[in-house]
């Protein structure tokens, strides 16, 4: 179908997230806007939106394939999100902003086996601006190589900012994450600049403590909710086109979210891990506490009117 051809023409990223001139099907996509028609102006647009609604207008006239699936991020918000080009490429790591000594940096690794299947991904988020600074994704880098990339990113931030105390990093410790912890132990945690952040031990926790973050259904849904609120309220700045592409295919499945069949969500998983790290960091850094609490708040929320009950 035309929709499939268009979507494949829009998919311009290779396995490492680098952008090419044409889509994966060899076609080059371009758009013709509704206002290029000589008989259509703002007045016509407003009347048409009033007749069919904004979402259908953007689908019918705006060249936007707004999905009917229940995406984590509102489909209209996804349609207006635009990524940018990296200012620097260090290997497969794409940098969208130069680190600054006045900010704190949250670096999250979602590991993978590195055998060509699932991707490993790293996200670098600046605090308290909540701006995406860098990302890395690869599916043929073994776990020792993933830890070296994590270390190189931390070292670059430390060298650029001259402030290793402003770096916090962590890994997901589910499944393959256990292998990552072993590699970190062999590599030497002290050889990676910054502080290794782990989730606090919960009351009633009986398992042996492991560093990093363990992802459960509950923690994933909570992190998804926070990510949704932050992006839809413009509290989090996303620069990565591959991440935006993943968000467009990240849909509700049962009571959770995951990528559509044939799509990936590894960059999202690393972002969710960074969100969970922020939940820990807010108890340490007053700037993060104030801004993260505000970022979690839905601006459209209105408290209910009070109810008074009188016995007379």
What are these regions (language model features)?
Residues 1, 126-256, 304-312:
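Mg2+-dependent endonuclease catalytic cores in nucleic-acid-processing enzymes, primarily RNase H-like
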Residues 1-52, 180-185:
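ASCE P-loop NTPase helicase motor core
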Residues 28-32, 107, 193, 211:
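Hydrophobic/aromatic beta-strand patches that form the interior of the parallel beta-sheet core
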Residues 30-32, 61, 135-136:
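Hydrophobic residues at beta-strand termini and immediately following loops
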Residues 34-109:
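ATPase catalytic-site recognition across NTP-hydrolyzing enzymes
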Residues 100-127:
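Gly/Thr-rich phosphate-binding beta-strand-loop-beta motif of the actin/hexokinase/Hsp70
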Residues 266-278:
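Stable alpha-helical structural segments in soluble proteins, enriched in small hydrophobic residues
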Residues 275-312:
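Acidic two-metal-ion nuclease catalytic site recognized across multiple nuclease folds
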């Amino acid at each position: 179908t035309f929709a499939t051809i268009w979507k494949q023409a829009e998919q311009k990223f290779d396995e490492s997230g680098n952008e090419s001139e044409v889509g994966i099907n060899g076609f080059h996509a371009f758009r013709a806007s509704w206002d290029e028609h000589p008989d259509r102006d703002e007045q016509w647009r407003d009347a048409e939106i009033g007749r069919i609604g904004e979402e259908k207008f953007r689908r019918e006239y705006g060249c936007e394939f707004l999905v009917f699936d229940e995406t984590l991020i509102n489909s209209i918000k996804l349609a207006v999100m635009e990524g940018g080009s990296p200012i620097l490429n260090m290997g497969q790591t794409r940098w969208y902003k130069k680190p600054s000594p006045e900010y704190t940096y949250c670096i999250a690794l979602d590991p993978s086996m590195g055998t060509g299947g699932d991707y490993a991904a790293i996200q670098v988020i600046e605090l308290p601006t909540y701006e995406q600074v860098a990302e890395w994704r690869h599916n043929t880098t073994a776990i020792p190589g993933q830890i070296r990339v994590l270390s190189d990113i931390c070292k670059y931030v430390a060298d650029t900012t001259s402030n290793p105390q402003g770096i916090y990093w962590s890994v997901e410790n589910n499944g393959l994450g256990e292998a990552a912890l072993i590699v970190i132990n062999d590599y030497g945690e002290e050889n990676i600049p910054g502080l290794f952040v782990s989730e606090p031990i919960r009351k009633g926790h009986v398992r042996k403590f492991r560093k990093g973050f363990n992802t459960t259904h509950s923690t994933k849904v909570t992190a998804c909710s926070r990510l949704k609120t932050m992006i839809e309220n413009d509290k989090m700045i996303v620069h990565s086109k591959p991440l935006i592409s993943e968000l467009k295919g990240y849909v509700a499945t049962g009571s959770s979210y995951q990528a559509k069949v044939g799509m990936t969500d590894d960059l999202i998983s690393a972002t969710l891990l960074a969100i969970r790290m922020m939940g820990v960091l807010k108890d340490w850094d007053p700037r993060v506490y104030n801004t993260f609490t505000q970022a979690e708040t839905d601006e459209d929320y209105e408290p209910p009117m009070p109810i008074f009950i009188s016995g007379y």
